[in-house]
Regions:
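OB-fold/S1-family single-stranded nucleic acid-binding modules
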Residues: 45-49, 54-122, 133-191
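A short, compositionally biased
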Residues: 2-5, 129-138
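N-terminal ordered "arm"
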Residues: 1-49
Length: 191
């Protein structure tokens, strides 16, 4: 996101999604803001880590209701989960905000589409990674028998591409910010 970072996770006690943001408008976080501290030093936050952070207030957007404005306290690492535990955090929506690769922002604004949550961790079928003719990273898969073809923002695309047969076919899907009248569905993490 604009050379910055989008981080999200689930609360371990309630399975509720939270997305830390830098301002009331849902701005992405700087590299400094996503560092955590543990007894060995300061490091960049990675997926599957259990991180403690404090926030100033809930700042929901109509397309991203999980947003929380963080304060300036350094995050703390509190263990990690391993990949086999991801199943404990799966979401079970009937679909991924419809069957297209995007959602009309006007339909969200006009409440024709209500976004109750903009993040899902889901188990998918027929999962494939590829680069399209424009060299853009994509994932195709079925969820609840509906075919999807979405952009991939997971920074480990190449690594996952080379080990696709070892993956659990679990994806974190995020509804992105408004861009040219749409909120695009993004594969933010692959497990």
């Amino acid at each position: 996101k604009h050379s910055k970072h989008c981080i999200a996770g689930k609360l371990v006690d309630s399975n509720k999604w939270v997305r830390p943001v830098a301002n009331d408008s849902g701005a992405e976080l700087s590299t400094q803001q996503i560092k955590y501290k543990n007894p060995y030093g300061k490091f960049l936050t990675k997926t599957l880590q259990i991180i403690k952070f404090t926030y100033l207030k809930h700042v929901p957007l109509i397309n991203q209701p999980e947003n929380y404005l963080i304060d300036d306290q350094v995050w703390k690492q509190n263990y990690s989960i391993n990949e086999s535990e991801i199943n404990d955090y799966l979401d079970m929506p009937s679909d991924l905000w419809g069957s297209e690769d995007r959602v009309s922002y006007n339909e969200i604004l006009n409440k024709k589409i209500v976004i109750k949550q903009s993040l899902y961790i889901v188990k998918v079928d027929n999962f494939k990674l590829y680069k399209n003719s424009s060299n853009k990273r994509r994932a195709s898969f079925n969820y609840n028998k509906v075919p999807y073809d979405l952009a991939v923002t997971d920074p480990f695309f190449e690594k996952n591409f080379s080990r696709i047969n070892e993956l659990q076919n679990i994806l974190c899907i995020s509804l992105g910010e408004e861009y040219r009248g749409s909120c695009f569905k993004l594969v933010a993490a692959i497990y």
